């Protein structure tokens, strides 16, 4: 029997203590890199302790294919506890780029048989037979240099060219740079590295090539095997490299890297809360529900980034990935994923708007949601009775707060998720503000009430069907198995624990349940049939027929886990054959795709989770955050989340105004101050929804729940602030909806980080809390308590203060001071308008809802009649095309301003143009009357007035539709 010593070498292990791994470096080894290889040996205590000798121990290594291994003597390194460690250093340039290095250890003993160590990065195998070690050695690859050289094969697509270098396997894309030089921008990816059976190999030189449609197919070396790969342009501005045949065993991990210096910055990655620029960070690409302080975790992730150099990179993997953006990887970034596939996309620009547009052209763009989605929403963590529903809606209308949607968050069902309204719960009365509000005798009554209040309904849901639900303390709730569970289990509609195993049952925050397998068509059809039945049950009578009151679904969850709960274990199995490990991020995409199909463009989603492609199923929100100004868990982090989401293609995005959680509340500021600042950010967000957990001690789930000393629920500054900003958000609808339509057509998001618009200005590279809202508005939310100033960077251009019309020069840091009352609102944030801008708003502030009047079927509510107020900041020639085809153009020069308005329909117009006082104002050549006073101007249908305080010419007229009206002054 062999008398083996207890020796080991496991490259992945962080040994000896304080050393990152037993092979240093573990990865990224180039020809000029010295490599240290250590072995451990137990020299005392029980078991197979033995005395390893330095003189009899050696490292033996060779280039794969060479006939013999060459020895390097091992040297004593150190002693730790019962273990001694020995090492050898492989000198730089011992091997060359592209070499596969094979090695094993010979361990000499005074009291044991000579022991040989071989294995993989994760496993050490001991034997007394040297030939066994030689046949199955440890390996590492000598990577090719970061920079490519030599001959290459190329594929052209318009102004772009894809390249694969024949002698190394480097992949590159070239195209115009910002200066307009053809092929002036070059991005190079080093030959990919893969792990097969615990050993690392590098895809290498091209053996042969064949032209294919839209590209080339190549055969490349990969250690002992060869792979077949394709280089193509699958969509405009996007180059794809994909291995289509591995020619042998599949990898369990793949990685790619590229040179990167300290001047390169990285954005995107999904919805990041910690920083917009992720340079210097290791980014974990894993969907995860981590309420409060999220650190580097995120609900929405994308194996994708946008570089300040004017390109993007997408690693197309649904598995968990790691993006090292110059953290451990120095002078380069490295992307790796635990997957058996390799496909990545280099996305060209060079303009960053074009990068995001090209990326969404490949992965999906958001269809245009219905108009009501862009009005403010009513929501609360829970509605315990129909009386509370009636109270909330009645008070919003009574207190003159415009709203267009009502969200039923959890619980509203009998059980999670049986998609059946709990009519017992909503039949109950409720007493609020010392007044009783009656419940609803029938579901139809509640839906009709909401419809005629001018509201579309959004229903919360999650992808689990429960075997038991938590007790929410509401009447009529089924705490046991949901009534639809057994049917789904019998149909194999749930994700399974293992191949052929039972349904996966996991603990989640609403009980214990099974996730629906959305990769299975039958399962998806089973669930969507229930949702369509729910829509049918919630139909209401419109002016011309019937329509579901429900217009959307709040699609909660879909992440890989929450806290200590794992929702998608590695061993889970989907009907498409993928495991939980392989599809951990892809699950939410199939979930959201399925639910979006129920309503399509007639509705929308409000999704918490997200992944590459889910931006095509609008919209989404920033999840659960805390009501404070903290840079780890509060309002500032949510702004960052919105901007990183935008760089990842998510355009129809919102957040919980006020912060959702009751934890870490407000300190050290007042509740009202935080709520007002969050509402201001909400106004200049695509979706504006107030939502928070319920606290029985207050009414802070409502905008009137923040009275300060000397104020009442009916009259308080926070309520006035919310009313003003929800009204402004509603009035901004023509501007906002136009940009939502632009997102549908181009993928360019509504929120835009400054760097997206000014990538040639390094001052914008790390700006986290100032952004463009569409093309023309620049917004800087206040992110500190009790302040009336805000420092911000104004990018290049001339800017006008939205509130005062003060003109500011760009490309400088400024300190903005809030205008003093009595101008409304009392509390303001920096908002600037770009010189040359044309900004359409709803005329007047009386609109109560953006729902279609045919749906509402209630003449008592004020809806938009099409009237437009247009703010114009003349600078040369500019124009704005409203979503309905209305074109407003402005030409300014030589002391004359000409505004032309082409509208497809008749409507009232109010033009507000920044200008000096004119001598006259003319419509189509005919002079208009100047109003003698503000009152006279308000009463007139046609005329003009000069606002000397703000420097605006105001012009009112009625447009006949189907014609062009010209205004000159």
Stretches with model-predicted labels:
Residues 1-152, 157-161, 168-170, 883-895, ...:
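Glycan-association/targeting regions that enable binding to alpha-glucans and other polysaccharides
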Residues 13, 26-28, 48, 77-79, ...:
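Residues embedded in well-ordered secondary-structure elements
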Residues 27-30, 233, 306, 901:
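Extracellular and analogous surface-interaction loops
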Residues 48-60, 70-78, 85-119, 138-343, ...:
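N-terminal accessory beta-strand-rich subdomains and adjacent acidic, glycine-rich linkers
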Residues 135-141, 288-289, 295-296, 340-343, ...:
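Ampipathic, surface-exposed secondary-structure segments
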Residues 138-140, 344, 829-833, 963-969:
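Generic detector of short, aliphatic-rich beta-strand segments that form the cores of beta-sheets
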Residues 146-152, 156, 167-168, 172-174, ...:
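Non-catalytic C-terminal accessory modules of carbohydrate-active enzymes
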Residues 176, 209-210, 219-224, 236-828, ...:
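Catalytic-domain carbohydrate-binding cleft regions of carbohydrate-active enzymes
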